[in-house]
């Protein structure tokens, strides 16, 4: 093995307390294990959370039977719930959260939980609002590090 590279033993499960990263998946809400149970000697990562579904007519892989972990009727509902999820990450930082990855950047096949549509033509939430939410979260993480 190359000792200059971090090892993620298993993304999402089957943890054997080896490797450098403990990568947990939780849907839809971001959660971390109780401190002291997992990850005492590992980097804690929320490798997947979110999965908020909003199909956009004319921009899906298929017309029916699309899904997300939680479904919404319009962009405003989606943005309100997404904002809540991002805000829920802040209290996890003092518990050791080092990274969080939203599922997912774009819709894929039957999953409509992307920030943008399958064809990449429509952002489901205003980019400026996403930038603002993410910057606020980043700034809170920097404050916790000091």
Where are these regions (language model features)?
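Substrate-binding/catalytic cleft of secreted carbohydrate-active enzymes
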Residues: 1-122, 132, 143
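Extracellular/luminal recognition modules and glycoprotein regions
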Residues: 128-129, 139
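Surface beta-strand/loop "capping" patches
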Residues: 135-146
